[in-house]
Amino acid sequence: MYAGHAALATLAKGARPRVPIGLLVPVAFAPDWIQWVFDAMGRGNREISHSLVSVAMGATLVALLYLLATRQRVDAAAVWLTYASHWPADYITGLKPTWPGGPTVGLHLYTRPFLEFCVEAIVIIVCWFVYRRSLPVAARHRTVGLLIPIGLIAMQIAFLAATNPSFRN
């Protein structure tokens, strides 16, 4: 999942408006960024970034840091869930490690790009509706608000086109 991670951050923002979106988006993408850093160092290992164990540890770390900084338990739980949402979201679209030495599992919808796009678009739209409900009434119906789901869906199309030649055909 690509744009869906950002959408899940907007879902968390909609549920917990006090938590900054500028924190939630990086938290939602954290396993990918950890993977890219290790890949750049020539030490790529998806168990370090994407296993259930590493996702649980990363989610716990960022949630504890947020709790220490804010003393807001429910908001810290939202931060934890945002990080942890990465694994089930990626389970839908790809293949993910469970634990070191454990099986790799997933629905691997990347092999079916149109279906993957449809699932991701649904995630984006549902998350946007939750986020939109958190806005002041006057702001909910502004056209500019549509830029969030449109932009995320456009990002997903670009991602699929760049990574899957059959999607372009």
Protein language model regions, located:
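N-terminal membrane-targeting hydrophobic helices
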Residues: 1-169
